[in-house]
């Protein structure tokens, strides 16, 4: 049995990983362990990649799982607009590494202002929408889209994409 370890105990990230494994019809054991990302609570731009990779590396070290998976949400200024997205990074114990990026979405100036004052996106969302701990539920994307797209949905596709070299190799003996 293949064991995949997620570098988080956030229920949204765990459920998104479960859904991705279900979509792929992979009967892997999933464990979620909180590990350090090595980046700020609210990473910007390239630090999002660093945080996701660090989570994957750290969780595979702590658990000795077959696959380490890190998910890190971040914010970046692109052409004068702040966008949010997530990076999903996978590492196997054999050293294969891959990553994928979620869809991105622009943030309203009210959120950007709070983020630039030191709040993380989840905190900014909670303040503006008068919610609590939205990062473990629908997330900023869910609040902004009236749950047409929620945080779990945002993560499933990049998890599938980050894992493709691993499950294709296991299923089809495709060399990567």
Swiss-Prot record:
<keyword id="KW-0479">Metal-binding</keyword>
<feature type="binding site">
    <location>
        <position position="36"/>
    </location>
    <ligand>
        <name>Mg(2+)</name>
    </ligand>
</feature>
<keyword id="KW-0464">Manganese</keyword>
<dbReference type="GO" id="GO:0103023">
    <property type="term" value="F:ITPase activity"/>
</dbReference>
<comment type="function">
    <text>Phosphatase that hydrolyzes non-canonical purine nucleotides such as XTP and ITP to their respective diphosphate derivatives. Probably excludes non-canonical purines from DNA/RNA precursor pool, thus preventing their incorporation into DNA/RNA and avoiding chromosomal lesions.</text>
</comment>
<comment type="subunit">
    <text>Homodimer.</text>
</comment>
<comment type="similarity">
    <text>Belongs to the YjjX NTPase family.</text>
</comment>
<dbReference type="InterPro" id="IPR050299">
    <property type="entry name" value="YjjX_NTPase"/>
</dbReference>
<dbReference type="GO" id="GO:0000166">
    <property type="term" value="F:nucleotide binding"/>
</dbReference>
<dbReference type="GO" id="GO:0006772">
    <property type="term" value="P:thiamine metabolic process"/>
</dbReference>
<dbReference type="GO" id="GO:0017111">
    <property type="term" value="F:ribonucleoside triphosphate phosphatase activity"/>
</dbReference>
<keyword id="KW-0378">Hydrolase</keyword>
<dbReference type="InterPro" id="IPR002786">
    <property type="entry name" value="Non_canon_purine_NTPase"/>
</dbReference>
<dbReference type="GO" id="GO:0009117">
    <property type="term" value="P:nucleotide metabolic process"/>
</dbReference>
<keyword id="KW-0547">Nucleotide-binding</keyword>
<dbReference type="Pfam" id="PF01931">
    <property type="entry name" value="NTPase_I-T"/>
</dbReference>
<dbReference type="GO" id="GO:0046872">
    <property type="term" value="F:metal ion binding"/>
</dbReference>
<protein>
    <recommendedName>
        <fullName>Probable inosine/xanthosine triphosphatase</fullName>
        <ecNumber>3.6.1.73</ecNumber>
    </recommendedName>
</protein>
<dbReference type="InterPro" id="IPR026533">
    <property type="entry name" value="NTPase/PRRC1"/>
</dbReference>
<dbReference type="InterPro" id="IPR029001">
    <property type="entry name" value="ITPase-like_fam"/>
</dbReference>
<keyword id="KW-0546">Nucleotide metabolism</keyword>
<keyword id="KW-0460">Magnesium</keyword>
């Amino acid at each position: 049995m293949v064991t995949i370890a997620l570098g988080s105990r956030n229920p949204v990230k765990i459920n998104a990983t479960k859904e991705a494994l279900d979509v792929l019809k992979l009967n892997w054991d999933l464990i979620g362990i909180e590990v350090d990302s090595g980046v700020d609570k609210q990473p910007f731009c390239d630090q999002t990649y660093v945080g996701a990779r660090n989570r994957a590396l750290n969780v595979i070290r702590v658990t000795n799982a077959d696959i380490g998976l890190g998910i890190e949400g971040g914010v970046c200024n692109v052409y004068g607009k702040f966008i949010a997205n997530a990076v999903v990074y996978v590492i196997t114990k054999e050293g294969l590494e891959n990553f994928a990026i979620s869809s991105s979405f622009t943030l309203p100036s009210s959120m950007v202002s709070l983020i630039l004052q030191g709040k993380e996106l989840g905190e900014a969302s909670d303040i503006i929408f008068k919610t609590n701990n939205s990062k473990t539920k629908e997330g900023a994307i869910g609040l902004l889209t009236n749950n047409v797209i929620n945080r779990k949905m945002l993560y499933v596709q990049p998890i599938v994409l980050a894992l493709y070299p691993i499950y294709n190799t296991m299923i089809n003996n495709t060399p990567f």
